[in-house]
């Protein structure tokens, strides 16, 4: 297996995405409506919106965990399905197997001589020295670092993040944001982050997309230099622009986004 550090630049470059006339319905309920979106290779995009607006459904469609009712998902000019080996998804829960050591969780499903690659991935997230420990010995933030290493070992060109930091305390969350931003800058993959935290979105993303009732309500470019100064008036102004748009809509208790697990996901249902 080739080292992450030895990868040719063209393999580390992110996947360009195109979403065309995307619709997703569950029965009579239309969750996504005519989504059109172009994401250049290597862009860091944050997707925000009220609970139940359709943002996690969009990520599941991009991950191949569900199929659109109508529309196209493209990686460049090819179907996104052709890029599944280059795509990895992280959830809010790390989903580590407690009966496997940390290094074995990182190399889960791989064959051949993968241990050196697993150690390198753990080194990238700052946990190489914990490789032979059990997941139970880790904090919540450390478990998410292992989940991130498990994605990195596959050398993704598209990284999909479904609120992976939502359960972390404030300081650990900022540390994870900085780590994800560092790895994105280092490896050049395309990132889509679903988050409820607007301040998080404007702090680390190139672009913030607001989903409103299944449609794109706002597409905001975050044209600020990195590293960004948290608490700056420029970040605060961008955050206020997004929040003002969200709060301008009448609030109503949303229905949860429908979820139909694939057979391979049923083991996580409990």
Curated annotation (Swiss-Prot):
UniProt entry keywords in alphabetical sequence: ATP-binding, Cell inner membrane, Cell membrane, Membrane, Nucleotide-binding, Translocase, Transport
How does the protein associate with the membrane? Peripheral membrane protein
Q: Provide the protein's localization.
A: Cell inner membrane
Recorded catalytic activity of this chain's protein: ATP + H2O + aliphatic sulfonate-[sulfonate-binding protein]Side 1 = ADP + phosphate + aliphatic sulfonateSide 2 + [sulfonate-binding protein]Side 1
ABC transporter domain sequence ranges: 17-238
> Membrane-crossing residues?
none
Molecular function GO terms recorded: ATP binding; ATP hydrolysis activity
> Mind naming one GO cellular-component term on file for this protein?
plasma membrane
Coiled-coil spans in chain:
none
EC assignment: the record states 7.6.2.14
Q: Cross-referenced InterPro entries, in alphabetical order? A: AAA+_ATPase (IPR003593), ABC_transporter-like_ATP-bd (IPR003439), ABC_transporter-like_CS (IPR017871), ABC_transporter_ATP-bind (IPR050166), P-loop_NTPase (IPR027417)
Annotated residues that bind ATP are located at: 49-56
Per UniProt, the enzyme's principal EC class comes to translocase
Which NCBIfam families does this one have?
Answer: PRK11247.1
Q: How does it assemble?
A: The complex is composed of two ATP-binding proteins (SsuB), two transmembrane proteins (SsuC) and a solute-binding protein (SsuA).
What does this chain do?
Part of the ABC transporter complex SsuABC involved in aliphatic sulfonates import. Responsible for energy coupling to the transport system.
Q: Which family does it belong to?
A: Belongs to the ABC transporter superfamily. Aliphatic sulfonates importer (TC 3.A.1.17.2) family.
Its recorded name reads Aliphatic sulfonates import ATP-binding protein SsuB 3
Q: Which organism is it from?
A: Pseudomonas savastanoi pv. phaseolicola (strain 1448A / Race 6)
Q: Which gene encodes it?
A: ssuB3
């Amino acid at each position: 297996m080739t080292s992450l550090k030895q990868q040719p630049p063209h393999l580390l470059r992110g996947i360009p995405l195109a979403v065309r006339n995307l619709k997703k319905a569950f029965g009579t309920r239309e969750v996504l409506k005519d989504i059109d979106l172009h994401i250049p290779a290597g862009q860091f995009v944050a997707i925000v919106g009220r609970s139940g607006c359709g943002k996690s459904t969009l990520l599941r469609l991009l991950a191949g965990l569900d199929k659109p009712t109508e529309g196209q998902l493209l990686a460049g000019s090819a179907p996104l399905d052709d890029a599944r080996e280059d795509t990895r998804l992280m959830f809010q829960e790390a989903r580590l197997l407690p009966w496997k050591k940390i290094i074995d969780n990182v190399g889960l499903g791989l064959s051949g001589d993968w241990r050196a690659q697993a150690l390198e991935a753990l080194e990238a997230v700052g946990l190489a020295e914990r490789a032979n420990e059990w997941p139970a010995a880790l904090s919540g933030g450390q478990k998410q670092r292992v989940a991130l290493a498990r994605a990195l070992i596959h050398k993704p060109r598209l990284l999909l993040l479904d609120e992976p930091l939502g359960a972390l305390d404030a300081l650990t969350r900022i540390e994870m944001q900085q780590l994800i931003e560092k790895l994105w800058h280092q490896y050049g993959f395309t990132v889509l982050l679903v988050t409820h935290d607007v301040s998080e979105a404007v702090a680390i993303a190139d672009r913030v997309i607001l989903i409103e009732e299944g449609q794109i309500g706002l597409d905001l470019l975050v044209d600020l230099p990195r590293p960004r100064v948290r608490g700056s008036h420029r970040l605060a102004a961008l955050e206020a622009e997004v929040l003002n748009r969200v709060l301008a809509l009448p609030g109503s208790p949303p229905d949860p986004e429908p979820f139909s697990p694939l057979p391979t996901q049923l083991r996580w249902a409990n």
